[in-house]
């Protein structure tokens, strides 16, 4: 499939028809339903996101039965996610998820730094013990060089 077709299907299904929230979404012949999500979720939204307003992202909480950690990041659609630790970075968290985004915002605490740090702690609580990574490279796919790769170094 071409990327235009995929993008068109995504926008039509998720934005215009809101199929995912309504439990009517299909992907590659599989029915997708937010109500089927059981594992803990970490949802990040950006306060200045002009494409997905954070208040809309917050509404996800009402559609999943799973425990949710909702985090509001400084920045916009891209900068809110690619938000490395630094003097301008901040994020907000709350201990509970009240019914509305406005109530959440009133009870949330603002933290200096990147939401990445919060996510690392959250993920560590749910992860197993650290293990050594598997060896890289195979006979058919030999190692080309050390990471991150020549293309990154320019």
Where are these regions (language model features)?
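Alpha/beta-hydrolase
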Residues: 1-35, 39, 105, 110-154
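Mg2+-dependent phosphoryl-transfer active-site scaffold
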Residues: 2-5, 61, 66-67
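Glycine-/small-residue-rich active-site loops that bind phosphorylated ligands and cofactors
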Residues: 11, 49-52
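Short beta-strand/loop motif that positions the catalytic acidic residue
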Residues: 43-45, 49
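Histidine-bearing beta->alpha loop at or near hydrolase active sites
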Residues: 48, 73-98, 102-103, 120, ...
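Short alpha-helix in the alpha/beta-hydrolase fold that links the catalytic acid
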Residues: 53-63, 74
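Intrinsically disordered, low-complexity regulatory segments
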Residues: 62, 85-88, 144-145, 152
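Short hydrophobic alpha-helical runs that function as membrane-insertion/retention elements
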Residues: 68-72
């Amino acid at each position: 499939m071409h990327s235009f077709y995929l993008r068109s299907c995504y926008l039509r299904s998720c934005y215009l028809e809101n199929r995912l929230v309504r439990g009517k979404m299909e992907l590659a012949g599989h029915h997708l339903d937010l109500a089927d999500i059981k594992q803990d979720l970490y949802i990040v939204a950006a306060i200045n996101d002009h494409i997905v307003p954070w208040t809309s992202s917050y509404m996800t909480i009402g559609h999943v039965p799973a425990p949710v950690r909702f985090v509001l990041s400084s920045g916009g659609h891209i900068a809110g996610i690619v938000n490395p630790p630094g003097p301008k970075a901040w994020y907000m968290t709350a201990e509970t998820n009240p019914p509305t985004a406005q109530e959440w915002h009133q009870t949330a605490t603002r933290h200096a730094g990147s939401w990445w740090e919060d996510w690392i702690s959250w993920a560590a609580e749910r992860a197993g013990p650290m293990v050594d990574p598997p060896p890289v490279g195979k006979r058919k796919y030999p190692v080309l060089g050390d990471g991150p790769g020549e293309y990154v170094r320019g």
